[in-house]
């Protein structure tokens, strides 16, 4: 049963208390009554209390009525000989800290609306503290940011107990601001560094929360785009690290390296590798530092190895990384299960990309073509309609491999020289073999597969056939296409059309019987 909203009387009472605190310092003790509402068990009352605290301390920050500097002990300050204004500011700053601490606790409240409102209020305080700092600058133009408060906010999101994916998605709106993004990366790095030091086994919830936050960080491509700051300053200084894209990339790199050095669940490995090539590598200060992570992922096997090859290919192609075993690892992933994995479409898209260079040696391309052809013998029709054009594209790109289709001066073969058990494509002897598998598939039961395999019977056209529309083809789609085909009005069943039940030529029945 849903709770009833807070009564109008309660809201009015909080309004009177707020007005009393802001208008008369002599009634400052009313702030305790406001803070007490934050301890209520009613979510509606808590939300009213949070809104009141937001207006109260937001106004005090703007008026600069909170103590600025290293906060002294409350009891010592009140017992000292300083003036009433000094004591009031110290006392009220302690109440402000109590409010922030309670708001941080509310980030784990069962009600999402309470958590969302607490987050909004804390971020409002971050903005106001940045504009009216509660610490004294060490020198002129010193960059001040409420790091302590902001660290508590991010720490409240990255908890090992509660799934904060929805709340983090709300926080991601603030990551559009360049200063929030920069400090969020720094705080996340420090939290990740302490993650395993406190306890050896870290919960999956923590890693999921961390990945949700990290994957939401997007850096601009040009430094002149760093103009959107959450904390407004009268003027910016080129000495501030937050205004330089180079420093943002360093923070981005440290954050991801700090995350990836831990032993992650396999589900997160896959998510990281899917985002690696377009969301992580382009923004790193030194992309080659990912080589250890990617090579380790390659050793895991299965879909993880497949996804890791994409990042390795980018490092090889764009950053001159030497990795001689790249194509051998790709070759090793070609087994019958590749047609049935979740990432089948992505794998063949990447394989087509990796084998697109015309500078690859002929023996290597021949090994891939032969392995694909051998696997095609047991592949389902939807996979064959994708694999067969890919094999033909390999032959188009590398004319030296066409001897596998037609070898006029070749010797007679009584056995296939290709060794399917050889892991090294250079030793598989694929170039000495032929693609007899394609001729076998010309007798396939599905006419579209038979037609695709028959392409090699003719001279291959120069332009390649795009396999992109075929990557995600399913058996259901093939079945639907067959159902939608328009059949001719009369289906020919014999070479000579029959005329009646006994109308065949040379039929003895027609010679002696007549149906009337």
Curated annotation (Swiss-Prot):
GO BP terms in the entry: ribosome biogenesis
Parts of the chain that traverse the membrane: 296-316, 347-367, 375-395
Alphabetically ordered keywords of this record: Membrane, Nucleus, Transmembrane, Transmembrane helix
Major subcellular location class: nucleus
GO cellular component: Noc4p-Nop14p complex; nuclear membrane; nucleolus; nucleoplasm; small-subunit processome
Membrane topology: Multi-pass membrane protein
Localization, UniProt: Nucleus membrane; Nucleus, Nucleolus
InterPro entries: ARM-type_fold, CCAAT-binding_factor, Noc4
Family to which the UniProt record says this protein belongs: Belongs to the CBF/MAK21 family.
UniProt-recorded name of the protein: Nucleolar complex protein 4 homolog
Species per Swiss-Prot/TrEMBL record: Rattus norvegicus
Gene: Noc4l
């Amino acid at each position: 049963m849903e709770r009833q909203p807070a009564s109008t009387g309660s809201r009015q009472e909080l309004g009177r208390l707020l007005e009393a605190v802001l208008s008369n310092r002599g009634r400052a003790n009313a702030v305790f009554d406001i803070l007490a509402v934050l301890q209520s068990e009613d979510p509606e009352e808590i939300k009213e209390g949070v809104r009141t605290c937001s207006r109260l301390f937001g106004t005090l920050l703007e008026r600069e009525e909170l103590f600025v500097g290293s906060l002294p002990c409350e009891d010592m300050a009140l017992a000292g000989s300083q003036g009433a204004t000094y004591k009031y500011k110290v006392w009220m700053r302690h109440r402000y800290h109590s409010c922030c601490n309670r708001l941080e606790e509310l980030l784990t409240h069962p009600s999402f609306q309470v958590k969302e409102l607490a987050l909004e209020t804390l971020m409002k305080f971050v903005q106001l503290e940045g504009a009216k700092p509660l610490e004294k600058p060490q020198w002129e133009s010193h960059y001040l940011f409420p790091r302590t408060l902001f660290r508590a906010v991010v720490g409240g999101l990255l908890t090992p107990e509660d799934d904060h994916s929805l709340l983090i998605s709300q926080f991601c709106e603030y990551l559009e601001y360049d200063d929030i993004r920069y400090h969020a990366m720094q705080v996340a790095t420090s939290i990740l560094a302490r993650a395993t030091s406190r306890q050896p086994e870290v919960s999956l919830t923590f890693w999921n929360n961390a990945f949700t936050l990290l994957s939401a960080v997007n850096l601009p491509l040009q430094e002149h785009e760093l103009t959107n700051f959450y904390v407004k300053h009268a003027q910016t200084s080129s000495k501030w690290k937050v205004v330089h894209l180079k420093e943002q990339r360093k923070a981005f790199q440290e954050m991801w390296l700090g995350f990836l050095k831990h032993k992650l669940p396999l589900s997160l490995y896959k998510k990281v590798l899917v985002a690696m090539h377009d969301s992580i590598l382009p923004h790193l200060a030194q992309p080659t530092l990912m080589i250890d992570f990617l090579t380790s992922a390659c050793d895991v096997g299965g879909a993880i190895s497949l996804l890791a090859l994409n990042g390795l290919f980018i490092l090889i192609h764009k950053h001159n990384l030497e990795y001689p075993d790249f194509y051998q690892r790709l070759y090793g992933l070609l087994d019958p299960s590749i047609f049935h994995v979740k990432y089948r479409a992505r794998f063949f898209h990447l394989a087509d990309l990796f084998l697109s260079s015309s500078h690859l040696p002929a023996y290597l391309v021949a090994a891939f073509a032969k392995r694909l052809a051998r696997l095609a013998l047991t592949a389902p029709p939807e996979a064959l309609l994708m694999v067969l054009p890919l094999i033909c594209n390999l032959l188009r790109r590398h004319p030296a491999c066409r001897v596998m289709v037609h070898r006029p001066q070749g010797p007679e073969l009584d056995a296939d020289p290709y060794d399917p058990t050889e892991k090294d494509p250079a030793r598989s002897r694929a170039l000495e073999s032929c693609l007899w598998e394609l001729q076998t598939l010309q007798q396939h039961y599905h006419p579209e597969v038979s037609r695709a395999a028959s392409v090699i019977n003719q001279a291959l056209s120069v332009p390649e056939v795009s396999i992109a529309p075929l990557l995600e083809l399913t058996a259901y789609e093939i079945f639907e296409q067959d159902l939608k085909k328009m059949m001719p009005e009369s289906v020919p069943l014999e070479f000579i059309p029959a005329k009646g039940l006994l109308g065949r030529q040379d039929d003895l029945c027609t010679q002696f019987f007549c149906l009337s």
